Amino acid sequence: MLLPLALADGESHVTIRGGTHVPFSPPFPYIHHVYLPTLWRMGVRAQVELQRYGWYPAGGGEITLSIQSNGGTLRPITLTERGPLRQVRGTAAVSNLPSHIAQRMANR
């Protein structure tokens, strides 16, 4: 829904509820740190905020998405060259498990 809203007139605000960190779906950090920056290069002006985590299988998460119209066009981008590695970053999180499990994952 993000791309059609970016091509539409005006500004849009969307609230999505459900799983934010679930199997077979992009987790919130991927959307925030990879997907949206790629779309930004194409002229899509969108911001996403995590309001509440939603873990599998319970869900209960919530994100808000704000999208500004870009005038109805997308800029082409070329993604054939990776370029220099600028940063490697990771996050370890657990739900309903002892915190030492996340710490152990982070230390690996």
Regions found by a protein language model. Give the residues of each.
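Phosphate/diphosphate-binding glycine-rich loops and adjacent basic-rich segments that engage nucleotide
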Residues: 7, 41-44, 51-108
